[in-house]
């Protein structure tokens, strides 16, 4: 069945080395933890944590203004994922409040066709935990999903909270065991899954050997799938990065260097919700959020320091660049303000940062670009 009404997406950036006036207009509204993708010269973005069901588009060749496209028919969605394949936009999952309980993961898929401005609900669903927390990238007609939270554990948690009926002691008895689980006991998906829209087929592309992730930054270039950081349990991130080679029998992996500690910190706690992309042959990533000190506490056996240890959710602005030869990272600059959980797309040797959020979860509507030539970082 088809639906008509209106779609699109954003993020922010800038650096200490070069900052110029932005060349793209702000979004009509702030969008954080939404979904979007680049299709040809047009970027699409929408949904997310502000509760909007709208999507917007911007023609990057003639970027005068964002246009509202057909409204998403699947209702409000926080943290859905999306990708563009063969001229169409695909949106998967997310979580929403339902009659069953709040924050329920929705396992479904929609296709948007720009040619006639319509949405179609697809007759398919993810075979694993790729509906919330997964990261996606498209290549060769396939959409690759990396990680994702465990569907049963997540939904069950909020169903149990609803059953507690507002009793704070009962809620504490639900949340305490959950947050004290080890990372591996959250059962984030370690599988790499692909979806091929042309055939409506899901495939198992192998396993990510460095623990399941949620909210990692991912990118594909020349048959290589890059994974940067991500959450490994509630409140805990990984500083690790890895590069996978896509083959006919799935993806094989090579461990890369950890992200270095940002200025002012002794240790890199990893980031979730980072935004990155390729520019002039270089991959750069920025933003994201973590709980500084969580990793050190976890290594001491303190599982929920982000909740009980006084740690603060912290958004970041360091910009990291990958050395493709050594597999190591370095900091090449900073944005003028912190950001996370926005859309990043690569276009004309620049990385567009669209929307997102900053300190306190404030949604952002700005669109900025980053470019890096191996020596200088420029933010517009």
Curated annotation (Swiss-Prot):
Entry EC number(s): 5.1.3.24
Keyword Nucleotide-binding: no
Positions of Kelch repeats: 42-86, 88-140, 142-176, 177-222, 225-274, 296-349, 351-380
UniProt superkingdom: Bacteria
GO MF annotation list: racemase and epimerase activity, acting on carbohydrates and derivatives
Signal peptide, first to last residue: 1-21
Catalytic residues (positions): 231
Class of this enzyme: isomerase
Compartments, as annotated in UniProt: Periplasm
Single GO cellular component term: periplasmic space
Key words of the record: Carbohydrate metabolism, Isomerase, Kelch repeat, Periplasm, Repeat, Signal
Reactions catalysed: N-acetyl-alpha-neuraminate = N-acetyl-beta-neuraminate
InterPro entries registered for this protein in UniProt: Kelch-typ_b-propeller, NANM, NanM_proteobact
Entries under NCBIfam families matching the protein: muta_rot_YjhT, PRK14131.1
Family statement drawn from the similarity comment of this UniProt entry: Belongs to the NanM family.
PANTHER family assigned to the protein according to its UniProt record, in alphabetical order: KELCH PROTEIN (PTHR24412), KELCH-LIKE PROTEIN 28 (PTHR24412:SF441)
Function: Converts alpha-N-acetylneuranimic acid (Neu5Ac) to the beta-anomer, accelerating the equilibrium between the alpha- and beta-anomers. Probably facilitates sialidase-negative bacteria to compete successfully for limited amounts of extracellular Neu5Ac, which is likely taken up in the beta-anomer. In addition, the rapid removal of sialic acid from solution might be advantageous to the bacterium to damp down host responses.
Record text on subunit structure and interactions: Homodimer.
Name recorded for this polypeptide: N-acetylneuraminate epimerase
Gene for this chain: nanM
């Amino acid at each position: 069945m088809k639906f008509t009404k209106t779609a699109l997406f954003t993020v922010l950036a800038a650096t200490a080395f070069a900052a110029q006036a932005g060349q793209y207009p702000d979004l009509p509204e702030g969008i954080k933890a939404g979904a979007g993708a680049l299709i040809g010269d047009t970027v699409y973005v929408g949904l997310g944590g502000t509760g909007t069901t709208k999507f917007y588009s911007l023609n990057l060749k003639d970027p005068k203004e964002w246009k509202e496209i057909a409204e998403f028919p699947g209702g409000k969605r926080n943290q859905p994922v999306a990708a563009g394949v063969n001229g169409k936009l695909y949106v998967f999952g997310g979580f929403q409040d339902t009659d069953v309980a709040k924050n329920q993961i929705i396992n479904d898929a929609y296709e948007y066709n720009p040619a006639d401005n319509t949405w179609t609900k697809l007759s398919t669903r993810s075979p694993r935990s790729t509906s919330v927390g997964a990261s996606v990238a498209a290549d060769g007609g396939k959409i690759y999903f990396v990680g994702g939270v465990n569907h049963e554990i997540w939904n069950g948690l909020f169903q149990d909270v609803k059953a507690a009926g507002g009793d704070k002691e009962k809620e504490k008895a639900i949340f305490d065991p959950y947050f004290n689980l080890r990372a591996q006991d959250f059962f984030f998906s370690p599988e790499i899954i692909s979806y091929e829209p042309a055939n409506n087929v899901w495939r198992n592309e192998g396993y990510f050997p460095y623990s399941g992730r949620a909210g990692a930054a991912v990118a594909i270039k020349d048959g290589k799938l890059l994974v940067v950081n991500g959450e490994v349990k509630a409140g805990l991130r990984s500083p690790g990065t890895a590069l996978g080679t896509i083959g006919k029998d799935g993806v094989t992996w090579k461990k890369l260097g950890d992200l270095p500690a940002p200025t002012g910190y002794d240790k890199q706690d990893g980031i979730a919700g980072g935004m990155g992309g390729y520019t002039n042959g270089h991959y750069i990533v920025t933003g994201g959020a973590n709980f500084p000190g969580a990793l050190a506490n976890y290594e001491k056996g303190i599982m929920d320091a982000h909740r009980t240890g006084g740690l603060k959710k912290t958004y970041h602005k360091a910009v990291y660049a990958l050395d493709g030869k050594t597999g190591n990272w370095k900091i090449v600059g900073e944005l003028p303000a912190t950001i996370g959980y926005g859309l990043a797309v690569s276009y004309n040797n620049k990385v567009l940062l669209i929307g997102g959020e900053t300190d306190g979860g404030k949604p952002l509507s700005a669109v900025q670009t980053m470019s890096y030539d191996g020596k200088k970082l420029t933010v517009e």
